[in-house]
Structure formats: C-alpha cells, structure tokens
UniProtKB/Swiss-Prot annotation:
Signal peptide: none annotated. Residues 1-84 form the YcgL domain. It comes from Aliivibrio salmonicida (strain LFI1238) (Vibrio salmonicida (strain LFI1238)). This is YcgL domain-containing protein VSAL_I1068. InterPro entries: YcgL-like_sf, YcgL_dom.
Length: 93
C-alpha cells in the first residue's frame, strides 16, 4: 500500500498520511483548517516497512477505514513535574 505523507504548516511535528497524492477529500475540513497548508514530504510504500514513531498497522487501518491518518507529536515533557518526582524519590531514600 502506497501513501503520501504531508507535514503541517501550523503544527510542528504533525503529519498527515493520505492514500492518493494531493487528494484531501477524505480529510474533514475542520482538520484541514487546523493542519494548515499541507507540505509534501514523501510518497512511501508501507508494505514491509517500519515507521519511526508510529505503528504501521494503525496507519494502514486508518487509511482503509477513514482515508487518512493523522500523526501528532508526543506531548512535551513537563520538566517541573519530572523534577518534583525525582526530588520526591530522593527524599524517600
């Protein structure tokens, strides 16, 4: 299965996978508005391939069922919360 991957012009780290190059008709208009102008990254064959930060099966299922897959970046790490947890662990010892 081939798909086209686009990056968002509005949300850093967000990528949109669609079945047909430049055919955004399956993507809800609200999502396209939030995504901004899509910038083509690549066309890729998903068969026998691993993707760095997303489960390939989820991509394939979403493409078949919805006609698109949205990859969002992981949430930013809360450094203050991490510091508090580390400090609490040190105090337990």
């Amino acid at each position: 299965m081939y798909c086209s991957i686009y990056k968002s012009s509005k949300k850093q780290g967000a990528y949109l996978y669609i079945e047909k190059k430049d055919d955004f008709s399956p993507v809800p208009q609200e999502l396209m508005t939030m995504f901004g102008t899509p910038k083509m990254v690549m066309v890729v064959n998903l068969e026998g391939r691993k993707l760095a930060s997303v489960d390939i099966e989820k991509v394939e299922v979403s493409l078949k069922n919805d006609g698109y897959f949205l990859q969002l970046p992981p949430p930013p790490e809360n450094l203050l919360e991490k510091y508090k947890q580390d400090k609490a662990k040190r105090n337990e010892k």
